């Protein structure tokens, strides 16, 4: 759900300048809408009712007046079981899974990252064994082994 919206007023390489309505914050994630694709970007500077955003995909075909949707969430990485078995890109997309999904679109797609394609960083369809060593109410500190 978009918390704020905006329109692109300038494109320069992988940077876009956006005039927005609503509240936004530095490091907030937004998406530049390009047809049926949404290109992930992060706010790197806010100046009044405009912000500069770094787009994490090719900005080819983005134009002035294209729509931008802001998420109200900061750029973050998800932590949990299964991370050590994956190879990720800078947005925590698991590259092997991304290639598999992309190859469904085009045979050539498995060699190149597809614009606007993002996957969950951790597998949601797996169960992980966890044997807790700490109990509810135990006082824990940094470095404690919980299980």
Language model feature labels by segment:
Residues 1-147:
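Peripheral, non-AAA+ core regions of ATP-driven protein-machinery
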């Amino acid at each position: 759900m978009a918390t704020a919206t905006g329109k692109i007023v300038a494109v320069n390489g992988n940077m876009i300048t956006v005039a927005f309505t609503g509240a936004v914050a530095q490091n907030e994630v937004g998406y530049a809408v390009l047809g049926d694709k949404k290109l992930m970007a992060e706010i790197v500077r806010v100046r009044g009712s405009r912000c500069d955003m770094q787009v994490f995909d090719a900005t080819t075909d983005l134009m002035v007046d294209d729509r931008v949707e802001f998420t109200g969430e900061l750029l973050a990485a998800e932590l949990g079981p299964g991370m050590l078995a994956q190879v990720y890109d800078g947005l925590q997309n698991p590259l092997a899974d991304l290639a598999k999904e992309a190859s469904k679109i085009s045979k050539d797609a498995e060699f190149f990252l597809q614009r606007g394609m993002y996957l969950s960083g951790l597998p949601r369809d797996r169960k992980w064994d966890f044997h807790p060593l700490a109990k509810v109410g135990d006082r824990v500190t940094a470095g404690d082994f919980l299980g």
